[in-house]
Swiss-Prot record:
The keyword Transcription does not apply. It catalyses: IMP + L-aspartate + GTP = N(6)-(1,2-dicarboxyethyl)-AMP + GDP + phosphate + 2 H(+). This is Adenylosuccinate synthetase. The gene is purA. The lineage of its organism: Bacteria, Bacillati, Bacillota, Bacilli, Bacillales. It is found in: Cytoplasm.
């Protein structure tokens, strides 16, 4: 048995899709365990660029099983569109498996997400308005509709009618907008269900059988630890658990089955949406990193907020996710910056703190304590090993590993798969 979990150690967008795609070559099963189509990952395959939001990035390999786990929330309309997107490009999806226990995102979830974000005004969370939060709310309130319900027209109609009765009161009385009619949703979404029915099964059986047979299973996290509903910058978080522990719940495998946890980080920090960001840059260096790193959201196209590498954040991620291996991405983006900074701790009211605060009020008042390192100007995009890196680049990478306490296993010097280098195997 060899299982690897890939998690983001920052606020998402660390390049998990690329690393998952890279590690997929040696995996036999690739599974997602939380989130929905709020996560976007870009994969370069055979020179073509693909953008996926729901389907695991291992879909490009016909011999590998790809799993949408029970912990995910699935927008059937978006899933059918993504399947068509792949089919139109000649990519087979016969290797896809969808959990019958995953919850379904319906039009009223999308509407609620949008209205609630508008209502909050200046206090908005910065959601992607994909209905993720409202779908997880229904799941927790035990009124959610699951994939297994979507496939049974009688059950789907009954649950949908019950939910619309409640949601329409909310739309009309609280938000002052028109609700939904049963016929607006029933036929269209039942049909989406029929289009995905052939992929639906109990995915926990698929995953546990694979692990028991000693096959290599890769679990692909979405978002990042700092967006985790329990461990992130609450309430500026997602509604699920991207931490490695989310695998046990969202994929239906026991904690004893997890062997390695790869924490993916950029060599700097980015964030989409609102919330405190201690190392954020509002200067020319920040603008330069954003442009060179093409830091615009895959899902929203929004410019990402950019800052220096924060080892307080990544140490927190290591602790709460049990990270065993570091994958450091986008080192090349920092080429040409004369002096680089790494945040080693925070200063709060004259005191040095090394743990990430739970209070956003405290966090907003924290000043980053920086260690300065000399930059490099050499082109590193063709580098294949640590030894080939310029002295300053290597020192920067090694210092990040030291400060975070995570051994370096993978580093990447460009967006292409060929620019991803293994220092030590995560499947060992």
């Amino acid at each position: 048995m060899s299982s690897v979990v890939v998690v983001g150690t920052q606020w998402g967008d660390e390049g998990k899709g690329k690393i998952t795609d890279f590690l997929s070559e040696n995996a036999e099963v690739i599974a997602r365990y939380q989130g929905g189509n709020n996560a976007g990952h870009t994969i370069v395959f055979n020179g073509e660029k693909y953008k996926l939001h729901l389907i695991p990035s291992g879909i490009f390999y016909k011999d590998k099983i790809c799993v949408i786990g029970n912990g995910m929330v699935v927008d059937p309309k978006a899933l059918v569109a993504e399947l068509k997107y792949l089919h139109d490009r000649g990519i087979s999806t016969d290797n896809l498996r969808i959990s019958n226990r995953a919850h379904v995102i319906l039009p009223y979830h999308l509407k609620l997400d949008e209205l609630e974000e508008e209502r909050k005004g200046a206090n908005k969370i910065g959601t992607t308005k994909k209905g993720i939060g409202p779908a997880y709310m229904d799941k927790a309130a035990r009124v959610g509709i699951r994939i297994v319900d979507l496939l049974d027209r009688e059950v789907f109609e009954e649950k949908l009618a019950r939910n619309l009765q409640e949601k329409n009161v909310l739309f009309e009385k609280v938000y002052g907008v028109e609700g939904f009619k049963l016929e607006d949703i029933l036929d269209e979404y039942y049909e989406y269900g029929q289009q995905i029915a052939k992929y639906v099964c109990d995915t926990s059986v698929v995953l546990n059988n694979a692990l028991d047979e000693g096959r290599r299973v890769l679990f692909e996290g979405a978002q990042g630890v700092m967006l985790d509903i329990d461990q992130g910058t609450y309430p500026f978080v997602t509604s699920s658990n991207p931490v490695a522990g989310g695998v046990t719940i969202g994929a239906g495998v026991g904690p004893t089955k997890i062997k390695h946890v790869v924490g993916v980080a950029k060599a700097y920090t980015t964030r989409v949406g609102d919330g405190p960001f201690p190392t954020e840059l509002h200067d020319e260096i920040g603008d330069r990193i954003r442009e060179v790193g093409r830091e615009y959201g895959t899902t929203t196209g929004r410019p990402r907020r950019v800052g220096w590498f924060d080892s307080v954040v990544v140490r927190h991620a290591r602790r709460v996710s049990g990270i065993t291996d570091l994958s450091l991405n986008s080192i090349d983006v920092l080429t040409g910056i004369e002096t680089l900074k790494i945040c080693v701790a925070y200063r709060y009211k004259g005191k040095v703190i090394e743990e990430f605060p739970a209070s956003l009020k405290v966090l907003a008042e924290c000043e980053p304590i920086y260690e300065e390192l000399p930059g490099w100007s050499e082109d590193i995009t063709g580098v294949k090993s640590l030894d080939e890196l310029p002295v300053n680049a290597r020192h920067y990478v090694e210092r990040i590993s030291q400060l975070t306490g995570i051994p370096l296993s993978i580093f990447s010097v460009g967006p292409d798969r060929s620019q991803t280098n293994v220092v030590r195997s995560v499947y060992a």
